[in-house]
Amino acid sequence: MRVRLGNIMAAKLNFSDIAWRSEVGLQRQGNEDSALVSNSLLAVADGMGGYVGGEIASRTVIEKLIQLLPTLENPELDNESREDLLSSSIESMDAAIAEIGAARPELVGMGTTLTSIALFDSNLLLLHLGDSRAYRLRGKKIEQLSHDHTVVQELIDQGRLNPDEIADHPQRSFLTQALMGKENLSPILLAYPVLKGDRYLLCSDGLTAVLDEAQIAKAMQQDLTSAVNSLIDLTYKAGAPDNVTVIVAEIGESK
């Protein structure tokens, strides 16, 4: 799915403040999450396929995004070209994972989610695949911008499952889309206008599996460092069965 938004002529807005943390879950031996935090691009990748394989897969896609950054930040590039670059980057990430799997058979089956937001010319570009999430807090209203690529979300979309039944569903963690080196991917690429004061949250499902939107929204109304620490603390208080990565960024005017 792809929605484009043309250049918006207004006061240039950027990520004026960013805070983040990544922690190991209480039932995990290592952290398979990877993250990217820069002035213009934020991303969370949640690896799967065993600790070693999952960590390699998530790190691989983050490294691909880092390699893409200089091109994305070229001031002569327009937003449509940036959207094309982000969209095509999914193929190169997936190919890189496939190449690693071919060279190391013990890693076949590894994979990762990817949820990223890029901010250029006061336009926010969301690139999403899997069940990590992106939220926007505007005032006191929180909105999920990403859409889970999971079996249970498909059932909800089809009207065959109620959202309050997710926690007990045997396939609650089954993904329908992930970067696993198997091609045939349909990432979400969406564009949003931003407002000064907007806050954006990127997180792995280690957070959203145990916290609801009301808890997330309340925590995000604190200063950014406190917001991140509160979200992590609440996750641990809820049992933290999975690794948890949280990035919170606020929109402000360029200096």
What do these predicted ranges mean?
Residues 2-255:
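PP2C/PPM-type serine/threonine phosphatase catalytic domain
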